[in-house]
Curated annotation (Swiss-Prot):
Residues that span the membrane, as ranges: 15-31
Membrane topology according to the record: Single-pass membrane protein
Organism encoding this protein: Talaromyces variabilis (Penicillium variabile)
Pfam families given in the database record: p450 (PF00067)
Protein name in UniProt: Cytochrome P450 monooxygenase pvhE
Gene: pvhE
Glycosylated residues (UniProt): N379
GO CC, one annotated term: membrane
Subcellular localization(s) per the UniProt record: Membrane
Enzyme class: oxidoreductase
């Protein structure tokens, strides 16, 4: 019998347990010492966020509590950045180093100048794989590059200038509005003065509208969620997204959560998409090309099926683009109408431009691209309410970020491989120090003021509603065109949109941040047509 076996056999369980604990502690200490040396050789540490409990549990508890109360923005503003006055800080959560930043230089480095050093990471891909698969939003390196090359050509001007898809669904939206839209639920029924006009939750209608547009554009099928709110595929897609968000926030604890609802909804979602994938693959690449050239209805799926015959690849890209195409557009339109309903002077200016440029006909691509005030309304909405308020990158190798290290935060901060960096576009866009001083020509940056965009433009990486660098949103122009079309058609018909939100949120909007930033209490408004149309307005 070896000396080691003899020693082990003579050890009591208590001694063995204590020895194991000591070895674990020594291992952790040695790991931290080695990590500390690497960090100091690369750069500096950032300002440390203190936690009231060990292992960052106090910080994690406060963060989860804020998320559940839909106070994520306030937590980032006050607890992460506000307490120190720094825009790049760090902490340890369950012994894992996490860096938080709202510094435009650091964000520029991650998204552009040091792009190859940062990515989604293997852990992100594993967490999202069942939902997003190997789509453009969940991958790095060659997989990401292949997805982008497949998707990008589908958003050319030729594709975007065909606005018939938008018009067809816009007419459905008008019919739903004429029928009264969604009735005000009992929770808010007594709070809203119905005598001021029929109040509807336009957010709900816009989410359904953009879902119909997206499925029509991507798959060639209108799922009709505007007229059938409980449409099975739409409901399944929503449930998968809802559960995925819960799993991500629960981190390691998600392993102990029931996934039945997620799996059942995923099965429905995948079944619907794979049916269309099989149909697209039944056409040869030559048949797909001939169909496109013949003027037949274009579908995104058939177009990309001309370049890959992998059904899983096709499914993954459809899910990724559908997620982005529906939610970001619907949320931004919801926020635009939230603010326009509180700023009648902006509605007057917007409607005046629309009537002078377009008149009463359906707008063309060129007309929509040449309305500066309409563009200003969307820019201002995305400035205050960026669609993706919080995001994460993982260091793919040992590297640095240019700002945040050292005693005053002016030196590079060291970032070891697999370190998580969380950044906030929402905080970045609301940093007062990045704007000109308030004056007659430049309104307080906390205020919704489209006019500022008529004579001011932000620095490139101070304003990133569609991300930046190589991962710049491929569907940016499609989203802007769709949003422009909706606002144009709405305000061709309606001269006024009236807010009923004062009775619900007191004028302080609830920033619901799941994946996408959306109005947490809906957007309850009423639309008013002009009592008499002046024919001179339409000349």
């Amino acid at each position: 019998m070896s000396v080691l076996n003899i020693a082990v056999s003579r050890c009591s369980p208590t001694v063995a347990f204590c020895s194991l604990v000591i070895l674990c502690i020594l291992f952790k200490v040695l790991t931290r010492v080695r990590e500390d040396r690497k960090i100091r050789s690369l750069g500096k540490y950032g300002h440390q966020i203190q936690s009231k409990l060990p292992l960052g549990i106090g910080f994690l508890y406060s963060m989860v509590k804020a998320v559940r109360a839909q106070k994520n923005f306030e937590f980032w503003r006050d607890n992460i950045f506000g307490a120190s006055g720094r825009w790049t800080v760090e902490t340890r959560i369950m012994n894992e180093r996490t860096i938080f930043t709202a510094d435009p230089g650091n964000i520029k480095a991650m998204l552009a100048t040091q792009f190859s050093d940062y990515g989604k990471g293997a852990a992100f891909h594993a967490m999202w794989k069942d939902f997003l698969g190997n789509s453009i939003f969940a991958t790095d390196g060659e997989r990401w590059s292949a997805s982008r090359k497949l998707i990008r050509p589908q958003f050319t001007r030729d594709r975007l200038s065909d606005l018939q898809c938008f018009e067809a669904h816009m007419q459905t939206l008008f019919r739903v509005l004429d029928a009264g839209g969604s009735p005000l639920d009992s929770k808010h029924a007594e709070e809203t003065p119905m005598s001021q006009g029929k109040a509807i939750d336009i957010r709900d209608l816009l989410y359904r509208f953009t879902f119909d547009v997206s499925t029509d554009f991507l798959l060639g099928q209108d799922v009709q969620s505007l007229t059938t709110p409980r449409q099975e595929f739409a409901h399944a897609f929503d449930e998968v997204q809802r559960m995925q968000t819960i799993f991500v926030r629960s981190r390691h604890f998600s392993k102990f959560m029931s996934k039945k609802s997620f799996r059942d909804s995923l099965k429905v979602m995948n079944g619907f998409i794979h049916k269309h994938v099989r149909r697209a693959l039944s056409l040869s690449p030559q048949e797909t090309q001939q169909k496109s050239q013949s003027g037949s209805k274009y579908t995104f799926l058939e177009a990309i099926a001309g370049f890959t015959r992998d059904p899983t690849m096709l499914r993954d890209q459809i899910v990724g683009v559908l997620l982005a195409g529906r939610d970001t557009t619907a949320a931004t339109l919801s926020w635009a109408l939230y603010e326009l309903s509180r700023h009648p002077e902006a509605v007057d200016a917007l409607r005046r431009e629309i009537l002078q440029t377009v008149g009463s006909d359906a707008p063309t691509y060129d007309q929509l691209k040449n309305m500066p005030y309409l563009k200003a309304v969307l820019n201002e909405t995305l400035r205050i309410y960026p669609a993706v308020p919080y995001n994460v990158r993982i260091a793919l190798e040992d590297t640095t970020l240019p700002h945040g290290g050292g005693p005053d935060g002016s030196e590079p901060i060291a970032v070891l491989k697999n370190t998580k960096i969380a950044y906030s576009t929402l905080i970045l866009h609301r940093r007062r120090d990045l704007y000109p001083a308030t004056s007659e020509k430049f309104a307080d940056p906390a205020i919704f003021s489209p006019d500022r965009w008529l004579h001011w433009h932000p620095s490139a990486h101070d304003y990133i509603p569609f991300s930046a660098g190589p991962r710049l949103c491929t569907g940016q122009q499609f989203a802007l065109m769709e949003m422009s079309y909706v606002l144009c058609r709405l305000f061709q018909r309606f001269e006024r949109v009236e807010s009923h939100m004062q009775h619900i949120d007191g004028g302080n909007p609830t920033l619901k941040a799941d994946i996408i930033l959306s109005p947490g209490d809906g957007v309850w408004v009423s639309f008013h047509e002009p009592k008499q149309i002046d024919s001179n307005q339409l000349l």
